[in-house]
UniProtKB/Swiss-Prot annotation:
<keyword id="KW-0963">Cytoplasm</keyword>
<dbReference type="GO" id="GO:0005737">
    <property type="term" value="C:cytoplasm"/>
</dbReference>
<protein>
    <recommendedName>
        <fullName>Actin-depolymerizing factor 3</fullName>
    </recommendedName>
</protein>
<dbReference type="InterPro" id="IPR029006">
    <property type="entry name" value="ADF-H/Gelsolin-like_dom_sf"/>
</dbReference>
<dbReference type="GO" id="GO:0030042">
    <property type="term" value="P:actin filament depolymerization"/>
</dbReference>
<keyword id="KW-0009">Actin-binding</keyword>
<dbReference type="GO" id="GO:0051015">
    <property type="term" value="F:actin filament binding"/>
</dbReference>
<dbReference type="InterPro" id="IPR002108">
    <property type="entry name" value="ADF-H"/>
</dbReference>
<dbReference type="Pfam" id="PF00241">
    <property type="entry name" value="Cofilin_ADF"/>
</dbReference>
<dbReference type="GO" id="GO:0015629">
    <property type="term" value="C:actin cytoskeleton"/>
</dbReference>
<comment type="function">
    <text>Actin-depolymerizing protein. Severs actin filaments (F-actin) and binds to actin monomers.</text>
</comment>
<feature type="domain" description="ADF-H">
    <location>
        <begin position="7"/>
        <end position="139"/>
    </location>
</feature>
<dbReference type="InterPro" id="IPR017904">
    <property type="entry name" value="ADF/Cofilin"/>
</dbReference>
<comment type="similarity">
    <text>Belongs to the actin-binding proteins ADF family.</text>
</comment>
Length: 139
């Protein structure tokens, strides 16, 4: 599926892995990246259900952009177990301008194919996706 705005296609495996996370709950997180020629969005990393939140945040590169999905489990004040699927556009300040522009221009089209996202975030540094921030946004 090509993105009309940026010309970037989405590899079919991206939607397959998202479906596995959403419906089958096989994964804790998925990160997606653009291939080296900025022509296609592909699966970068997949974390299994036992993966910690720190492992997820540590998987995000300091100097490059990513799209990420995180399945966050939590317990409400009423002691009810819940889950929220987060979509994160990771665009660190230190990333190259070209990368930031292409990720931003492809963001809406890519995100629109991921039905079931409950919380969206854009982050430029780790503080914007701290565990406390995620907990606050999940409620």
């Amino acid at each position: 599926m090509a993105n009309a705005r940026s010309g970037v296609a989405v590899n079919d495996e991206c939607m397959l892995k998202f479906g596995e996370l959403q419906s089958k709950r096989l994964h804790r997180f998925i990160t997606f990246k653009m291939d080296d020629k900025f022509k296609e969005i592909v699966v970068d990393q997949v974390g299994d259900r036992a993966t910690s939140y720190d492992d997820f945040t540590n998987s995000l590169p300091e100097n490059d952009c990513r799209y990420a999905i995180y399945d966050f489990d939590f317990v409400t004040a009423e002691d009810v177990q819940k889950s929220r699927i987060f979509y994160i556009l990771w665009s660190p300040s230190s990333a190259k301008v070209k990368s930031k522009m292409l990720y931003a221009s492809s963001n809406q089209k890519f995100k629109s194919g991921l039905n079931g996202i409950q919380v969206e975030l854009q982050a430029t540094d780790a503080s914007e996706i701290s565990l406390d921030e995620i907990k606050d946004r999940a409620r």
